[in-house]
Amino acid sequence: PKVARTIVRLMAKPDDEKGLIHAHSYAIADRLRELLDEFGVSGRVRGHDSDNRDAALSGWKRSDDPDVFVSVKMEEALDLAGDLCRWQVLCKAPYPNTNDSRVARRLEDGQWNWYYRTALRTVIQACGRVVRAPEDHGATYLADSSLLDLFGRARSDMPPWFERQVDRLERPDLPAFDPGRAGGAESDSASRNRPNRGSDTRSIEDHPLSDVWGDG
C-alpha cells in the first residue's frame, strides 16, 4: 500500500505529466493496479499483460493524456524522450529470481557480487528511460528501501557518474495523499487499458537521477 500511496501523491502533482512505474513482476503490477483502483484513480492508470505488452505501450505513448503506465520488465530498450514520460518510479530492487535454477546455482557457489551487480545494472538501465539527451529532463523516484540497500551492497560496481547521483539522493516535496487531486476517477475514463492478467540543466541537474529519493 505504501508504494501505491506514493504513486497517488505523484499523480497529484500539478504538472499533469505522464509517469512510468517499474513494477518488476506481474504480481506487483497486479497488486498496484488493484490498490490504485481502490483509491479511485484507475482512470489515469494503464497496464499490460504478457500478451498485449507492445500494443498497450504503444497506446500509452500515443495518448496525450497524463496517464501512468504500470510496466513489467521494461527497464531496457525503451525510449521515452521528451513529454512521452517525465517521471518514473522504481518499486523495489530488481534482483534476479532465486527460483530460477541458474540463479540459485550461482548463489550456491557464492556469487553474491554477481547477484547485486545484475540488479544494479537493471536499475541503471531503468534510470535512462525518461532522460534521453542532455537537454531532456525527468525524475526517478525510489519507492522502497531495498534500492538503497542495493546501492550500498553494489557501491564498488557503480560507474562514477551514477555514484555521484546516488550521493545526491534527496526526498522530494510531494503533495499530501489525496486521490481527488490525482484525478482518474472511474467516471473520467472507465477502466481505460486496465488489463487484468489472464485476460487480457544541461549539466548534472538534467541527469536521470537528479531528483531521486528513497522511502525507507
Label every PLM stretch briefly:
Residues P1-G216:
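ASCE RecA-like P-loop NTPase motor cores
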